[in-house]
A protein has these predicted regions:
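Helix-loop-helix hairpin linking two adjacent transmembrane segments in secondary transporters
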Residues: 129-175
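Conserved MFS/SLC helix-loop-helix module at the cytosolic interface between two early adjacent transmembrane helices
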Residues: 50-86
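Helix-to-loop junctions at the C-terminal end of transmembrane segments
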Residues: 51-63, 252-264, 351
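Extracytoplasmic gate region of multi-pass secondary transporters
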Residues: 19-20, 200-242, 249
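Cytoplasmic membrane-interface "Motif A"-like loop-to-helix N-cap segments
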Residues: 61-71, 261-274
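C-terminal transmembrane helical hairpin of 12-TM major facilitator-type secondary transporters
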Residues: 266-312
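Juxtamembrane intracellular "pre-TM" segments in multi-pass secondary transporters
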Residues: 177-205
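Cytoplasmic helix-loop-helix junction between adjacent transmembrane helices
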Residues: 94-133
């Protein structure tokens, strides 16, 4: 089930994030300026925001298999449709609709992993599942630009279409919904809205929003920082970004394993928040004094700032329970995506008006604000013994 969850989410991310690799072709062949091409590339993400919570509700009602199969099939259909039309307006509409469908994988694959693995293994397996995003971005980067350059935008869009179609078939054939009692036989406390009478889930959402700010800044501006501030070539900067993404994926897995061993999801989140604040603060200082160490610090920040993602995701699924976790995970993803949409223009303006060091220093404040909000006392593993 872990392999299927990883594969379906990876294929969805090839569609969601892979459109960004069409920007050079849209700019050169379709005459779009970079702002217009960037808007086209963002349409799948905008579509996701609209439906994440709705897909979570469907997962809670009908299970993971149906949602993964139908969602992947609809994503494939939208990608095939986008590849079949010439009008950029029509392409944009289908990309938006595809994003709405691709959102299905986020909540469903997360619940699939949590449902089939015991508590002492969930951190590790969720960390592995969380690597779907960087792996999907990497796969898209390897294939889509070359297809677009050699055969055009339509041919390039066929790649995520075929990938998502394959994911739909695999989900329909291979997914087995994790066991849970029928709603009629469930305990009353399992059916109660976990957001009522408790601030725990809201606090985790807030912490995740605050921690996604440095993550988004690092991922968005590392390339341009290396090229304009550190004087690197585009090829060298791109290679460094790829290297940092790979390390970030490994960091998510390591953080998950760490949480399993210590028997806590939220204590590690708090420690990671401290690490993120320190890393961003050091980055601001080393960049201000033009130290060559700033590049190593940026790599460390690239790893630390993404390491909490799987832990928060797992904690939310465990706290919300089998009848509410789909909606809770949808809410988590929606809040993070909205934040990720706001951060680049805001910090881009700050960098333009001031400097990179000031932007990095401001970033360091967000993890510090998150520290007192981490609901450590409500940790879902507080009654589980650490593993050995």
């Amino acid at each position: 089930m872990l392999v299927i969850a990883l594969a379906t989410t990876l294929c969805a991310n090839v569609f969601i994030n892979g459109v960004a690799f069409l920007i050079p072709t849209l700019h050169a062949e379709r005459g779009l300026d970079l702002a217009e091409a960037g808007l086209v590339s963002a349409l799948p993400s905008f579509g996701m925001v609209v439906t994440l919570i709705a897909w979570g509700y469907l997962v809670d009602r009908f299970g993971e298999r149906i949602v993964l199969a139908v969602g992947s099939a609809l994503t494939a259909a939208a990608a095939f449709a986008a590849a079949s039309v010439d009008s950029l307006v029509a392409v944009g509409i289908f990309l938006f609709l595809g994003g709405m469908a691709a959102a299905s994988s986020n909540s469903a694959s997360g619940r699939l992993v949590v449902g089939w693995f015991p508590p002492h293994q969930r951190g590790l397996v969720m960390g592995i599942r969380q690597t779907a995003q960087p792996l999907g971005v990497g796969l898209g980067a390897l294939v889509i630009p070359q297809l677009a350059q050699s055969s055009g935008v339509s041919a390039a869009l066929l790649f995520p279409a075929i990938a998502c179609a394959a994911a739909a078939v695999v989900s329909a054939v291979g997914v087995v919904d994790p066991p849970r009692p029928p709603r009629a036989e469930a305990r009353p406390e399992d059916l109660v809205n976990p957001y009522r009478g408790s601030s725990t889930l809201w606090r985790i959402h807030a912490v995740s929003v605050l921690l996604v700010v440095p993550q988004c800044v690092v991922w968005t501006f590392t390339l341009v920082w290396l090229m304009t501030d550190r004087g690197w070539s585009a090829a060298s900067a791109g290679a460094m970004v790829t290297f940092a993404q790979i390390l970030g994926a490994a960091g998510r897995i390591a953080a998950g394993r760490w949480s399993d061993k210590v028997g806590s999801r939220l204590h590690p989140v708090r420690t990671i928040a401290i690490g993120a604040a320190v890393a961003m603060g050091l980055l601001a200082v080393t960049d201000l004094i033009h130290s060559p160490l700033s590049i190593a610090v940026m790599v460390v920040a690239s790893v630390v700032t993404v390491s909490d993602n799987g832990l928060a995701f797992t904690a939310i699924a465990e706290l919300a329970g089998p009848f509410w976790s789909g909606r809770a995970l949808g809410t988590q993803n929606t809040s993070q995506l909205l934040t990720a949409g706001i951060v680049p223009p805001v910090f881009g303006a700050l960098i333009t008006m001031a400097s990179f060091p000031l932007a990095f220093a401001v970033c360091a404040l967000f993890p510090l604000i998150a520290l007192p909000l981490v609901p450590v006392a409500a940790d879902p593993l507080r009654n589980q013994p650490p593993t050995t």
